């Protein structure tokens, strides 16, 4: 156990940063390697300040670059793989998503075998399980239910294939004769300071007289705070490195939620921003069934125009379903196998996130002020 090291891919991202901040507190960790395509200068500076007893090495490169991955994995004890393209709206080209999310994961697994890395933790997503229909209700779902996303949309499809590859790699023989142990974590919708979807919703509202656009008023979900998802990764690596706990965790996937109240996406955005005068759109909205079929018609238009023009619909059947389903999950299995319990309460998570939303509001005010001067 002495002098181990950890590689975190996607370490410049929303979740990856939080994992790194928790990792530096781990005992006997000699080095953290943070990998991403590029790191913002301010994040590089923050990472440099985290260094105390633990060396922190910044690696910039492509997840599809095999020699780069092999170098990154050399002498590493644990890989936490969070790097991926997240695109629920279909903005990014399908081939790019499949390459990064699926091929990149496969190349990283192969690099682990060559470098004899014994532990691999994959950040999956709730979307590999669905929802497949807004009419299907899943409340307090669990890992024993045979749920699988059937949408052809590239993001959930790529994450599903990548997760299958990671779990199938459990038990592979490493170059040094050891064994690779893997597991996957499926977090709910993640919110918190720096959250890209929440940030987009808040900034859009600030430019729309403080009115929050409806993104999912018919949904019931259990969002999870980013700090708790990061904590689950720490517990997963501890479990896979513990000879007593590892057998029950190897090759398994876990839903990661916390004690955030079950609610709609719209309500979450409102709760986190109402202190600053933001409000929900009170205008009449279309019935869900009609929105679904309009989404279908927009898909048809996009398909018909595709030979001459790339039309990106504002929504489609998949996004309508994703944003308006009753789809909640329990973290009991993670509690049992990983000794997971949320590090942050709902009240703590809410307070931290609201403070961050306040910083977005202040920045918006400063921007308006500078434009009028």
Swiss-Prot record:
Q: What does the record give as EC number? A: 1.1.1.145, 1.1.1.270, 1.1.1.210, 5.3.3.1
Pathway, per UniProt? Steroid hormone biosynthesis; Steroid metabolism
Q: Which reaction does it catalyse?
A: a 3beta-hydroxy-Delta(5)-steroid + NAD(+) = a 3-oxo-Delta(5)-steroid + NADH + H(+); pregnenolone + NAD(+) = pregn-5-ene-3,20-dione + NADH + H(+); 3beta-hydroxyandrost-5-en-17-one + NAD(+) = androst-5-ene-3,17-dione + NADH + H(+); androst-5-en-3beta,17beta-diol + NAD(+) = 17beta-hydroxy-androst-5-en-3-one + NADH + H(+)
Q: Does the keyword Isomerase apply?
A: yes
* Location (main, coarse): endoplasmic reticulum
Catalytic site residues?
159
The protein in question is named: 3 beta-hydroxysteroid dehydrogenase/Delta 5-->4-isomerase type 1
Membrane-crossing residues? Answer: 288-308
BP-aspect Gene Ontology terms: C21-steroid hormone metabolic process; steroid biosynthetic process
Q: Where in the cell is it found?
A: Endoplasmic reticulum membrane; Mitochondrion membrane
Residues involved in NADP(+) binding: 10-15, 155, 159
Q: Establish whether keyword Ubl conjugation is in the entry.
A: no
The record's function comment reads:
A bifunctional enzyme responsible for the oxidation and isomerization of 3beta-hydroxy-Delta(5)-steroid precursors to 3-oxo-Delta(4)-steroids, an essential step in steroid hormone biosynthesis. Specifically catalyzes the conversion of pregnenolone to progesterone, 17alpha-hydroxypregnenolone to 17alpha-hydroxyprogesterone, dehydroepiandrosterone (DHEA) to 4-androstenedione and androstenediol to testosterone. Additionally, catalyzes the interconversion between 3beta-hydroxy and 3-oxo-5alpha-androstane steroids controlling the bioavalability of the active forms.
Q: What Gene Ontology cellular component terms go with this record?
A: cytoplasm; endoplasmic reticulum membrane; intracellular membrane-bounded organelle; mitochondrial membrane
What is the protein's species of origin?
Macaca mulatta (Rhesus macaque)
User: What Pfam families does the record point to?
Assistant: 3Beta_HSD
How is it placed in the membrane, per its record? Single-pass membrane protein
> Which domain of life does this protein belong to?
Eukaryota
Keywords, A to Z, come to: Endoplasmic reticulum, Isomerase, Lipid metabolism, Membrane, Mitochondrion, Multifunctional enzyme, NAD, NADP, Oxidoreductase, Steroid metabolism, Steroidogenesis, Transmembrane, Transmembrane helix
Q: In which tissues is it expressed?
A: Adrenal glands, testes and ovaries.
The record's comment on protein family reads: Belongs to the 3-beta-HSD family.
* Lineage per the UniProt record: Eukaryota, Metazoa, Chordata, Craniata, Vertebrata
Q: Which GO terms describe its molecular function?
A: 3-beta-hydroxy-Delta5-steroid dehydrogenase (NAD+) activity; 3-beta-hydroxysteroid 3-dehydrogenase (NADP+) activity; 5-alpha-androstane-3-beta,17-beta-diol dehydrogenase (NADP+) activity; oxidoreductase activity, acting on the CH-OH group of donors, NAD or NADP as acceptor; steroid Delta-isomerase activity
Q: Which InterPro entries match?
A: 3Beta_OHSteriod_DH/Estase (IPR002225), Lipid_A_modif_metabolic_enz (IPR050177), NAD(P)-bd_dom_sf (IPR036291)
